[in-house]
Design a protein with these regions (language model features):
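Domain-length cofactor-binding catalytic modules of enzymes
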Residues: 1-151
């Protein structure tokens, strides 16, 4: 779904229809396009990682607009397709490994768990570092998984 937003293109403000495929909004606090409660912090950006390493909360740039129409990543991204993950990752061994690291797991089948295995995703911490370096969004806090439910 596209959203009508104001963006500066070649020095002129224009109303643009923005469709973010594989991305989410990441506006600065001074953009004039976010809730007043986020004017001091910038727009919250939730970046899920995987069930083993964790996720991040980021915020839009401190000031101004990033070079991606106020957009940022919205996840670590897959390194393996679901099919590849099911073929190469042992769901029972994965469950044991995650539980041994203190993460409680509830999954309907081991195959379902394999699809979402940490090895099936890119390194979320590296994605966050690159997102920050690119000026798309700023890291605020890293969250650690405690419980995973996969249906």
């Amino acid at each position: 779904i596209a959203k009508i937003e104001t963006h500066n293109i070649h020095g002129k403000n224009c109303q643009c229809a923005i469709h973010r495929k594989g991305a989410t909004r990441a506006f600065s606090g001074d953009s004039g396009q976010i809730e007043s409660s986020f004017q001091l912090t910038g727009q919250p950006v939730l970046v899920p990682g995987d069930m083993g390493t964790g996720s991040w909360i980021m915020a839009g740039p401190k000031t101004g607009q990033n070079q991606a129409f106020g957009s940022s990543c919205h996840g670590a991204g897959r390194a393996l397709s679901r099919t590849q993950a099911k073929k190469t990752i042992d769901g029972k061994a994965l469950k044991k490994r995650l539980e041994n690291s203190g993460i409680r797991i509830h999954a309907s089948t081991p195959n379902v768990l394999s699809e979402e295995a940490p090895d099936a995703y890119k390194d979320v911490d590296e994605v966050i570092e690159l997102t920050n370096k690119a000026g798309l969004a700023r890291p605020v806090v890293r969250m650690k998984p405690n419980i995973v439910v996969k249906g």
